[in-house]
């Protein structure tokens, strides 16, 4: 029987517009797809194709400059139409015009039961899928020279408006199990599931240790699960893998081909019919989101969930780790009489400043993107600890990162954290600090120092 880990710290934020499991959204046929390097944190891309070249799905579009073995596969077959660059020639995306009849590079079917760890890694490297594996410390895309003491997969997505992985798992059970079995050849695999998830593919997963997490957000964060099961110390490495990527891996071993289809939630109060769309990595958002928006102005479109996602627009694409596209009010057209002084019941408050807490925890809120205040000194103490279910002193770690005290950061557990672990803390922070950016900057600095 799976171990149940009860977490008490955290905060569930119920927003209007959660995607319905029963609604399947139409995806318009599109010719152009794009692979975005920024979706793979820590990767400096080196483009290995030229405009006008024809590629098959599974062929590399770019590699990790620091480790050229790590390739990133094209989601479709077609002609490379553009390599878009930004400031200082930064690669923004590689665009491919899809063929009418798709062709995939055949890497050969493999029986994962007879493979060893090196064979699994080599197969993922060859097919351009290895870069979907992240690591702690530093919360970046990993490289094949790392030796993980364990591999963590969290099937629990509990951020506001997050997609339900059980929806994506439907019809992909065999691929999911195959992917888990493959990774178990590299290191011990821990699968984290939620107390309310009852899919047999999760509860009865083989070749892994299943742990059930019962608690508020961010219980589904893989970093939180690592902290409670097998914390990362200096000099140690664990791999963390998105469950969607596990399905990608499984399909590769079962079919010998790269198949980057996934079910993405389209959610938020600004969406007409919140539901799920089956898309490829690299699909333009305009193909399945444009017709679903209630309005085109005063709307914040987010590639991801409202707490950890990235602001985008209709020119954006589904990222390698995207599991939901959300749309919430921007809030720039609001004119509230008396501001926060006016008593109200429709606003969310963790400190019970409004009467909305009387309606219970299940009340849904239509929150907008406003910060409602400027950055200020850290005066309130203990705010982070109430919503950070990890065995670290979050407030002191943030202060150590701000002051650049690397020794103190290491003592306070920076190797165990990733930016999204502080997403809820950032939401409740009365100092209005960008905690996720602070943590990311600290991890980047530490990574350079230890290189």
Regions found by a protein language model. Give the residues of each.
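Mobile cofactor-carrier "swinging-arm" domains
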Residues: 1-15, 81, 86, 94, ...
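N-terminal, Lys/Arg-enriched amphipathic/low-complexity engagement segments
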Residues: 1-48, 63, 213
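Short, solvent-exposed loop/turn positions at domain surfaces
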Residues: 43, 49, 66-69, 273
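Short, well-structured beta-strand-loop connectors
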Residues: 49-63, 82
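Glycine-rich, histidine-containing beta strand-loop boundary motifs that form or position
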Residues: 59, 65, 76, 84, ...
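Short coil-to-beta-strand transition motifs
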Residues: 69-77
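Buried, small/hydrophobic-residue-enriched core segments of structured protein domains
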Residues: 70, 84-451
């Amino acid at each position: 029987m799976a171990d149940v880990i009860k977490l008490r710290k955290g905060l569930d934020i119920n927003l209007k517009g959660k995607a319905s499991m029963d609604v399947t959204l139409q995806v318009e046929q599109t010719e152009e797809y794009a692979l975005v390097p920024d979706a793979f944190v820590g990767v400096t891309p080196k483009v290995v194709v030229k405009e006008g070249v024809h590629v098959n799905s599974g062929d590399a579009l770019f590699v990790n400059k620091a480790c050229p073995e790590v390739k990133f596969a094209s989601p479709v077959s077609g002609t490379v139409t553009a390599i878009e660059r930004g400031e200082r020639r930064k690669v923004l995306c590689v665009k491919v015009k899809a063929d009418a009849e798709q062709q995939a590079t055949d890497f050969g079917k493999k029986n994962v039961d007879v493979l060893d760890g090196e064979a699994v890694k080599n197969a993922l490297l060859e097919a351009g899928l290895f870069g979907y594996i992240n690591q702690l410390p530093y919360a970046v895309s990993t490289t094949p020279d790392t030796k993980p003491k364990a591999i963590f997969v969290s099937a629990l997505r509990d951020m506001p408006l997050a997609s339900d992985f059980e929806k994506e798992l439907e019809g992909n059970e065999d691929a999911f199990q195959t992917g888990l079995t493959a990774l178990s050849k590299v290191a011990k695999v821990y699968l984290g599931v939620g107390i309310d998830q009852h899919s047999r593919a999760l509860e009865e997963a083989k070749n892994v240790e299943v742990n059930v997490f019962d608690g508020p957000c961010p219980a589904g964060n893989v970093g939180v699960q690592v902290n409670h099961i097998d914390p990362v110390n200096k000099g140690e490495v664990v791999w963390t893998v998105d469950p969607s990527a596990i399905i990608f891996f499984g399909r590769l071993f079962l079919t010998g081909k790269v198949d980057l289809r996934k079910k993405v939630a389209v959610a938020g109060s600004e969406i007409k019919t919140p539901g799920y769309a089956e898309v490829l990595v690299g699909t333009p958002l305009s193909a399945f989101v444009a017709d679903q928006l209630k309005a085109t102005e005063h709307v914040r479109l987010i590639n991801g969930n409202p707490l950890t996602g990235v602001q985008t627009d209709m020119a954006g694409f589904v990222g390698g780790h995207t599991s939901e596209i959300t749309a919430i009010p921007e809030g720039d057209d609001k004119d509230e009489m008396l501001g926060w002084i006016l008593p109200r019941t429709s606003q969310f408050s963790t400190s019970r400043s409004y009467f909305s807490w009387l309606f219970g925890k299940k009340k849904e809120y239509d929150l907008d993107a406003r910060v409602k205040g400027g950055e200020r000194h850290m005066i309130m103490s203990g705010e982070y600890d109430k919503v950070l279910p990890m065995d670290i002193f979050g407030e002191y770690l943030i202060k150590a990162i701000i002051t650049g005290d690397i020794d103190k950061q290491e003592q306070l557990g920076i190797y165990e954290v990733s930016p999204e672990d502080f997403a809820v803390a950032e939401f409740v922070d009365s100092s209005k600090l960008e905690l996720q950016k602070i943590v990311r900057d600290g991890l980047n600095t530490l990574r350079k120092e230890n290189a």
